Amino acid sequence: MAPAATAAAPRLLRAALLLLLLVAAGRRAAGAPVVNELRCQCLQTLQGIHLKNIQSVKVTTPGPHCDQTEVIASLKTGQEVCLNPTAPVVKKIIDKMLNKASAN
């Protein structure tokens, strides 16, 4: 082999090993779950909203992302608002939405 080819061999080997390491790390990360948000979504809440304006309600229980119960209402206008889960009006809304869903 020529001296130039011999000097390039370690660099080529190093580049190939680095590429192999990156490919292996990428495959391992591909199977990991993806978490969208690691914080609470509701920074401000409403005490209530009229039931006729609500399309659906999503209740998120406390977990690693947030230590509070979150109630997110999707309105018929397409907007989403956060509701105070401890407000009496919100508790009634959740009960009505659950009863409506179980009746269907």
UniProtKB/Swiss-Prot annotation:
One of its GO terms (cellular component) is extracellular space. Plays a role in monocyte adhesion to the endothelium. SUPFAM superfamilies: Interleukin 8-like chemokines. Residues 1-31 form the signal peptide. Its main location: secreted. It is found in: Secreted. This is Growth-regulated protein homolog. The keyword Cell division does not apply. GO terms for molecular function: chemokine activity; growth factor activity. GO terms for biological process: immune response; inflammatory response. Keywords: Cytokine, Disulfide bond, Growth factor, Inflammatory response, Secreted, Signal. Belongs to the intercrine alpha (chemokine CxC) family. The lineage of its organism: Eukaryota, Metazoa, Chordata, Craniata, Vertebrata. It comes from the Eukaryota. Disulfide bonds join C40-C66, C42-C82. CDD domains: Chemokine_CXC (cd00273).
